[in-house]
Swiss-Prot record:
Entry GO terms, CC: cytosol
Binding partners and assembly: Homodimer.
Enzyme Commission code: 2.1.1.228
GO biological process: tRNA N1-guanine methylation
Keyword Metal-binding: no
Subcellular location, principal: cytoplasm
Reaction equation(s) it catalyzes: guanosine(37) in tRNA + S-adenosyl-L-methionine = N(1)-methylguanosine(37) in tRNA + S-adenosyl-L-homocysteine + H(+)
Name used for this protein in its record: tRNA (guanine-N(1)-)-methyltransferase
The keyword Secreted is assigned to this record: no
Binding site for S-adenosyl-L-methionine: 119, 139-144
Function: Specifically methylates guanosine-37 in various tRNAs.
Lineage: Bacteria, Pseudomonadati, Pseudomonadota, Gammaproteobacteria, Alteromonadales
InterPro entries registered for this protein in UniProt: Alpha/beta_knot_MTases (IPR029028), tRNA_m1G_MeTrfase_C_sf (IPR023148), tRNA_m1G_MeTrfase_TrmD (IPR002649), tRNA_m1G_MTases_N (IPR029026), tRNA_MeTrfase_TRMD/TRM10 (IPR016009)
Homology family: Belongs to the RNA methyltransferase TrmD family.
Length: 255
């Protein structure tokens, strides 16, 4: 980890060039270029034992598909851990892992050093997981061709929580899920678009009323679209009043 970086990330992948999407573009790209995030990649193919740089092997017991070869993967993990120094958390991106959410991203951001293993083929040897992996994480109940896209998703979610990565300190705080709620609607110019007006309160200049409106919309949108999230929240008195007001206005509008 460099002196200025707030997050050290190491990725083990057979396709390291895929990660150019987050190291060269957007807020994560700027964070890498500015040194807030120290990003590194290790390709198991560089540690292959034969001239063909073989990185896959047959699974014991037969069956379709191949597994990532153990020795190149072990060496890549060892090199990543050596570069990271003490305290690095090794994560395997796996559909069997804990499902990533905002709370999980916040927990991972506090780790400061992350080594992500992006699997390919049918996965990796179970003994590698048992001996070298600290945690398994998933981005959802669906199948992808490899762990690179899940790893990039995790990196992006965690990077947004690193101080200084976003242009405005409140940006991460106002994102969906940051307080357990969905985000409120947002509007920009023009004031009228296809005969639809920007809500008057947003033009009022009354910051207290604007904040109250945004909170009410956030509560209402969560109630409409993700009511399960409300079950995990202990609403304040103000939030309960605003949600009740939103529900009343919504039911009135629906007739």
């Amino acid at each position: 980890m460099t002196q200025t970086s707030s997050l050290w990330v190491g990725v083990i992948s057979l396709f390291p060039d895929m990660f150019d999407a987050i190291t060269d573009q957007g807020v994560t790209g700027r964070a890498v270029k500015s040194g807030l995030i120290d990003f590194n990649c290790w390709n198991p193919r560089d540690y292959a034992l034969d001239k063909h740089r073989t990185v896959d092997d047959r699974p014991y017991g037969g069956g379709p598909g191949m597994l990532m070869m153990v020795e190149p993967l072990k060496k890549a993990i060892a090199e990543a851990k050596k570069a990271a120094g003490d305290g690095a958390k090794v994560i395997y991106m796996s559909p069997q892992g804990r499902k990533l959410d905002q709370q999980g991203a916040s927990e991972l951001a506090s780790s400061k050093k992350l080594i992500l293993i992006a699997g390919r083929y049918e996965g990796i040897d179970e003994r590698i997981i048992e001996s070298y992996v600290d945690e398994e994480w998933s981005i959802g109940d669906f199948i992808l061709s490899g762990g690179e896209l899940p790893a990039m998703t995790l990196i992006d979610a965690v990077a947004r929580l690193v101080p200084g990565v976003l242009g405005h300190n409140q940006s991460a705080e106002q994102d969906s899920f940051s307080d357990g709620l969905l985000d409120c609607p947002h509007y920009t110019r023009p004031e009228t678009l296809d005969d639809k007006q920007v809500p008057a309160v947003l033009l009022s200049g009354n910051h207290q009323e604007i904040a109250k409106w945004r909170l009410m919309q956030s509560l209402g949108r969560t109630w409409l679209r993700r009511p399960d999230l409300l079950h995990n929240l202990a609403l304040t008195e103000e939030q309960a009043v605003l949600l009740a007001k939103f529900q009343q206005e919504y039911q009135k509008a629906c007739g």
